[in-house]
């Protein structure tokens, strides 16, 4: 199976976790796009969705799936999204698609976070994939200097503005032994909106696409 076929398999497998009559949190990226395609097949069974990006919102609306503002709802039972890396503790690096802040907000609200990914995203130690950090534009240089002090090599992601109007620094050269500690440290930097480490709030279930089928890992 190709990588895209593995992504499609986990996107459809995530439908098993959708409860009829509920609002579903939807992530961003190529794997989440397959979940949106799958969700369209049961769109009349759900109340609607909450979206983590303008890109996902456009795809959902193209299928005629209702999209709610997160502020309009009191609770969210499920959030489904991909990951750039996921370790054995269900902690992740996310934000390759620059939607990390809205993704993290929805993950915080949701009762259950289902991570969908192909097997290439599984790692023992996070950090081979550059760690995205969303930053207020005027703080870019300051935050970059502080990230160097933490052992990283930050690189400004050119020509990318987030849906929130901010910029992204991608941090290389990190071997993230203590993800929660690093998440806390980077989030504490003035000018940082959020970091793409999903460690304090990781996934509850991971659906991993493999050549032998979809593997389910539970926290």
UniProtKB/Swiss-Prot annotation:
Keywords: Isomerase. GO terms for cellular component: cytosol. The active site is at 103 (proton acceptor). It is an enzyme of class 5 (isomerase). One of its GO terms (biological process) is D-ribose metabolic process. Substrate binds at residues 28-31, 81-84, 94-97, 121. The keyword Isomerase applies. The keyword Isomerase applies. Homodimer. Catalyzes the reversible conversion of ribose-5-phosphate to ribulose 5-phosphate. This is Ribose-5-phosphate isomerase A. The gene is rpiA.
């Amino acid at each position: 199976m190709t990588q895209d076929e593995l992504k499609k398999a986990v996107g459809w497998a995530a439908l098993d976790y959708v409860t009829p009559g509920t609002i579903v949190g939807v992530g961003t990226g190529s794997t989440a796009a397959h979940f949106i395609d799958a969700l369209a097949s049961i769109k009349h069974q759900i109340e609607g969705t909450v979206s983590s990006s303008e890109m996902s919102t456009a795809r959902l609306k193209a299928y005629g799936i209702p999209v709610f503002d997160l502020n309009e709802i009191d609770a969210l039972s499920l959030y489904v999204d991909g990951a750039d890396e996921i370790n054995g503790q269900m902690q992740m690096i996310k934000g390759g698609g620059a939607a990390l802040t809205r993704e993290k907000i929805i993950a915080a609200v949701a009762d259950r976070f289902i991570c969908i990914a192909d097997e290439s995203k599984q790692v023992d130690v996070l950090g081979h994939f550059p760690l995205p950090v969303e930053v207020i534009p005027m703080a870019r240089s300051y935050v970059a200097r502080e990230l160097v002090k933490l052992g990283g090599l930050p690189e400004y992601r050119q020509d990318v503005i987030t849906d929130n109007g901010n910029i992204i620094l991608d941090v290389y050269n990190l071997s993230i032994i203590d993800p929660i500690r690093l998440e806390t440290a980077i989030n504490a930097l003035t000018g940082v909106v959020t970091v793409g480490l999903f460690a304090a709030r990781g996934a509850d279930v991971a659906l991993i696409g493999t050549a032998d089928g979809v593997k389910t890992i539970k926290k």
